[in-house]
Amino acid sequence: YVTEQWDPVPAYHDILMKLVADSLRGCPELNTALIEGNIVQHDLVNIGVTTDTERGLLVPVVHDVRSKSLQVIAEESAKLVEQTQAGTLPLDKLREGTFTITNLGMYDIDAFTPIINLPECAILGVGRIVPKVVVVDERTLTTGIRRIMALSLTFDHRLVDGGPAAKFLQTLKSLIEKTQ
């Protein structure tokens, strides 16, 4: 999926952005917003990535993620993070997010409950990746060590029910497991 020649090499959040955008195809309800009492269905998937700065938390947005290659996402994301950290991010790069990803894995957090970035419908919380013993064959109960990452989805029940949200997570899980 990723080659070493890429510059920059995509970070986990870049890969997750692409996989989230693909997963939202099957659950467009999560790509909505409640604006002035109206449910707005977004055509584009614009994903914000939470970024901790000396000035507080900011959420720069990669626009139209579905139409971009992983390499382009990685390039844009790296530039956004750099500008955010430097305090030079243009305000328009903080606008029009339709879904947010937040990652606390670098702080050794396994799982957490993220708070929705309103007016968006949902936010995906990403925990650290850790090796764990898991059953790899349910028929024989064979175990093995696999790298596991917890995902926490917080969503607005006014906009989407639990079933579609669970379907989104199921699709995302499947895509992550297939990605090498």
Annotate each language-model stretch with its function:
Residues Y1-Q180:
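C-terminal catalytic/motor cores of large multi-domain enzyme assemblies
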